[in-house]
């Protein structure tokens, strides 16, 4: 089923079909932003679904359904992160302290460390590198961010270098 939906009587059916086609993508985005914490992933998924419903009528078909969902979901996660950052939880404070005190031998899961490092990047760079890691092309990322493909390529290269340096620093 293609967007945009002009027949409002089928809106709910089309929306549910879109969710079914893309539930793995939505879960993946929420999982990355929630650092894999199951309860937080569920909360994030609910927020993303609400946002997708809210903006469902605005999709104009200039990008793929997958690209549009990624952009709405990522923007929702960034909004939640900004909201959460105003009031850090005890868990966030403890996690930050643990990360700073870890040695290379204490890190069991390099993917978890990478997720934490990505979550510390500036919002747009974090979104771009996540989209790249999720397999989106430079063209698709450019559509999501309103940047040129060249700018996307440059940001990805710089962000990879920055993450490499941060990762190596944490592993020492």
Predicted regions and their residues:
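Short, charged helix-capping/linker segments at alpha-helix termini
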Residues: 8-17, 27-47, 58, 144, ...
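Residue-level preference for hydrophobic side chains embedded in well-ordered alpha helices
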Residues: 18, 22, 26, 30, ...
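C-terminal flanking helix
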Residues: 23, 27, 49, 126, ...
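Structural recognition of an alpha-helix C-terminal capping motif at a helix-to-coil junction
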Residues: 43-50, 54, 63-75
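Hydrophobic positions on the alpha-helical face of helix-turn-helix-like DNA-binding modules
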Residues: 48, 72, 128-129, 141-142, ...
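Arg/Lys-rich amphipathic alpha helix in sigma70-family domain 2
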Residues: 58-60, 71-91, 107
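DNA-recognition helix of helix-turn-helix
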Residues: 78, 145-170
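Amphipathic alpha-helical segment used for protein-protein interaction
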Residues: 98-130, 134-146
